[in-house]
Each structure stands twice: as structure tokens, then as C-alpha cells.
């Protein structure tokens, strides 16, 4: 009976509610990856919003040529592909040692696959528009973006949440945080 009570106490001791409040310094250490990731993700959000707003309105932003608009969309695709490649090769394997959310075939990597299924179609369409093979139609562009927009935005938020201080402190020490690949 004593072992059951000790195990119950140990379980309670590791719940987030029972963790001591982080000092501002500790919070910065534990939240550093979330802050860094959010900088990248905010750029993706800004670019997505510009592209999606134009597609929804049926017109490019004022003063932007067709070529600039299409190239902006292609850069978004290239940057997101590169971002996910870096995560999957250099960051997720380190995090996956202790954090289940970053392991293969779990939520975050599954989201990458779902995003890229739509992103690849979006990119192929823009490449066809850039080459002159297709004419850019904003309704088509919006429909392509709608295929992966929800999972993309969910992923951008989920990843930062997983890297947040309150979650990271469950798995890593401050010393380990200082050695992270970001």
C-alpha cells in the first residue's frame, strides 16, 4: 500500500500544476526555441496572408506584377520545404529523444506530410503559371490553398506550443536547452 501511495505522490509531483514557477531567466531559456520558431512561422503566416488575401479578392496586391506575385508564391513554397527539411533532419531527431510529439509518424511529422500534399500541388500550379503553361486564376489558387491551409495554420501553432517553456521544462534541463540545435 505504501508503494501505491508513493507512486501516486510521484505522479502528482510531475504534473505541470506542481512544477515551480519559472524565473524570467529560466522562462527565456525554456522558451527560446518557441520564440525562434515563431519568428519563422510568423513570416510564413504573413506571406500566406498576402497570397490568400489576393486569391480571395481575385486581384494581386497593388503595384505587384504578375511575375512578382507568382515568384512570391514560389518562394513561399521553397522556404517552407527548406524549413521542414531542416526541422526533420536536424531539430526533430534531437527533440524526439524525449518528446513523443516529434517522433516519426506522430502528429507534427504527419502534419508535415499533409501540408506538403497540398503545397506540392500549389507549387506545381505556380510553376506552370510562371512558365506560361497555365494562366493564373485566383479562384484556382485559392482552391489550392484551401486544401492545406487549415493543417498549415494548425501546425504553425502546434509546433510553437510544443516548444513553449511550460512543455519543454517537462523534458529538458536548462543545460540541455542551451545545447539545442536552434
PLM feature segments, named:
Residues 1-182:
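Small-residue-biased structural context
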Amino acid at each position: 500500500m505504501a508503494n501505491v501511495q508513493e507512486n501516486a505522490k510521484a505522479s502528482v509531483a510531475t504534473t505541470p500544476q506542481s512544477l515551480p514557477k519559472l524565473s524570467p531567466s529560466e522562462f527565456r531559456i525554456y522558451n527560446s526555441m518557441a520564440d525562434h520558431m515563431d519568428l519563422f512561422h510568423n513570416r510564413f503566416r504573413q506571406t500566406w496572408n498576402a497570397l490568400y488575401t489576393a486569391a480571395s479578392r481575385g486581384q494581386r496586391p497593388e503595384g505587384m506584377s504578375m511575375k512578382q506575385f507568382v515568384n512570391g508564391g514560389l518562394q513561399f513554397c521553397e522556404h517552407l520545404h527548406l524549413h521542414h527539411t531542416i526541422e526533420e533532419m536536424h531539430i526533430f531527431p534531437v527533440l524526439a529523444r524525449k518528446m513523443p510529439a516529434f517522433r516519426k509518424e506522430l502528429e507534427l511529422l504527419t502534419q508535415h506530410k499533409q501540408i506538403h500534399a497540398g503545397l506540392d500541388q500549389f507549387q506545381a500550379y505556380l510553376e506552370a503559371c510562371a512558365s506560361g503553361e497555365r494562366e493564373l486564376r485566383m479562384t484556382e489558387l485559392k482552391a489550392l490553398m484551401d486544401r492545406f491551409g487549415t493543417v498549415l495554420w494548425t501546425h504553425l501553432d502546434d509546433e510553437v506550443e510544443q516548444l513553449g517553456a511550460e512543455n519543454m521544462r517537462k523534458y529538458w534541463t536548462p543545460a540541455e536547452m542551451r545545447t539545442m540545435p536552434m
